């Protein structure tokens, strides 16, 4: 080691060793590179072989056709040079198209997909349309190459090959146009979701079929995993686009609408999926100690562990995952302060809201609508308070939010209208096995209870060769399931009514008067739809209870009592709130009323209808709650109508203008008169006392108010001489009168007696005896001109003797004598 030769040899040895290692490393790297490329090369070779085989087959068939035509008709082959020129030209076109298309795809990928998540990039690379177009162009080039080889070896070609070549050339050009359009579409990253939407559509249809695959639990679980994976990719697409600028939110909305369409399709097919299918996910649910069993509590205490959660079927996992994507997109709209997109999304929800009611998803959908309301309310209210161009859009958003609850009730009514209890239960008695049950037509059979029932029936048939279970027991079991679903419907209707009313009430409390009036106007609509629901339910419930023969099987009581109570509470609170916001809004928009909704008219007409309805029901508390604020509303509405109709100065319109302008107070007098008559008939002075106290309070507020009463008396006196004919509200007023006439005639207190000449109402009331004592031939009272009762009994005491109101018939002379 001390010699120089040793170190020289060592130096060269290390150098040689380094060169050998470097060479080995280089060779290894190249081998690994070739190994990695080999997979691509294998794929290329496979594709090439397939293209060559298909092109050879096509060329062979065309050559055979050419040979047949030339032999059959003794034709000469085409000139080889012409075929070569056309083929080379076509190859050149295809090559240019392929190069341009690949460059276009590469530019789109680098601009839009270079930093996307892996799943999105893979979707772009696997786009069916793009790959199909490239495959057709490559196949055309291979086919042209084979044609050139045929020309080179001197094969005779004729029209069949030429026509095929021209057809394929045209197809390449058309393919490029489609591919170019697809490139434009793929520049929007939402468009790559189309293939996943198609896959999810197919999955939903497949899992709802009763075939070999969907009855197998392995395939049920497989479909769920495939759908969950596809939804996760949709979520990635939505999340990736959270940073797009506001002007591209419209594209995001289209993506959300596709999700809603998928959810709607799923709900229409969900009833076909068996309740125990592994398609439905399982969800852990924490237990409460006070609800746990003895054994569970003992194990937890002995081991020091908490009570183990229980797994339950998560039947809403699919729609829940889809709506989470939409919820994230809505939050993006709100972050951008884009209330117009929120409004459009609420419009898109209307169709699926009706579907939810129709396909037994109502309670779940109400919770979703409430969540949308909760997150969007701050932004909507901010635009309501700002007098900007988005204020009308915010009002429309409130309108559409309430419309969704109404659409839900419409869907529920459609479902209720299709329930034929007798036919449905009779059909259930014809089934002898669970697999025979048509759970799509009768979704009430899709439960654990019904499955056990039909398994037992099938066992009876297998063992005893005869069904032992009686028909009444089958009907009772199915009726029990329908009974439970009716209870859910009642809960949903109650929640929907309360939600709409709460929206209006909260907006009114926060001084958004126009928005509150908009929301409260929907309360009347939804109450009307709910009355239809109640009518259906109250027809169905007794029929179901008749099927409950075995009383040892307890049914949880279902009734509409709480629903009626909720409706009554809302009807009592609604008028006062609606009057406040409608009056406030009308005063603020008095001058530009033509550009605003007539909420004051809406309020007046609905309040009037509510008063008539309360008289019909003999509900003094409701009448009192509404009537105490009614006169102020009438005075404002009278002036509102008068200032609008006096614009018509034509002489021939004078009678019509007067009739319309004086209608509000005439109707107030009519309703007040009907209330007095009803109180007299029921022998309850509270009705008349209320009418008199409201009028007295008005007179005592200002001495000048007596002058207003004089003017009203003169106007009503003039209306008696009106020869207009049928006015625009005369039929409505007559209808109110007839409803009270009918209520009196149908009341148990209604009695008649005969005098020497006619049948008369039996009563101790002098007012009724003089005003409507005579009974008509059809056995009912006549309350025509009921406004006279109010004017004579209540108003005349505040009028001078020479201006007192007089009826047409003069019945007041006998009454006052």
State the predicted function of each range.
Residues 31, 72, 83, 98-99, ...:
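A generic structural signal for ordered alpha-helices
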Residues 54-70, 79-153, 173-183:
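Transmembrane alpha-helix detector for multi-pass membrane proteins
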Residues 1-95:
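Membrane-anchoring hydrophobic segments
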Residues 29-47, 106-108, 113, 211-229:
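Terminal module of membrane-associated proteins
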Residues 5-17, 122-124, 149-816:
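Binding/recognition "hotspot" determinant
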Residues 33-49, 77-92, 116-136, 156-165, ...:
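Membrane-interface segments at loop-to-transmembrane junctions
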